[in-house]
Amino acid sequence: MGPAYQRTTVRADLSALPADLAAALRDHAESRQLTITDDLPAWITRSINPPSSSLTGKLFGRRANPADPDSEHQTLVALHPTHLLVVVSGANRGISALSVPLAVATVETPESADGFAVTGFAGQDGRPGSYHLGVGEPHGAECLEAVRAAIMAAKNP
């Protein structure tokens, strides 16, 4: 069984985002009194959920990750000076945004081959939540290192 997703991560120009992603990012940031400028470091990952390679999957027209409602989705990661912002968009899943203060965030180790998890988001029962950020070439490793460095800098001013 191959990877569940085919991913491509590139640097994102916040002034050139699709309208729905830009609106979700700005609305979420505004609701948290964060100022978004077009020069913030950001990356966008396109995740394609390919058709299943198994015989049963092919027979029933399933995808590699049958739990994902979309054949593809986009994930935007933006580094604000004090927060990590994430916006996810897909045809069936819709669009959602979340953020975590860098000072309470942690990059979980070990990272997976196709991404990394960040802990510190609002979770359930008073415990911190975790979110997996899938990344790919050519700039996935750069995204991970920038997120890790921003978290470390926020914790060690």
List the model feature ranges, each with a label.
Residues M1-L76:
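Anionic N-terminal interaction surfaces
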Residues G2-L34, G94-P157:
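Low-complexity intrinsically disordered segments
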Residues S54-G115, R127-P128:
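Phosphoinositide-binding peripheral membrane targeting modules
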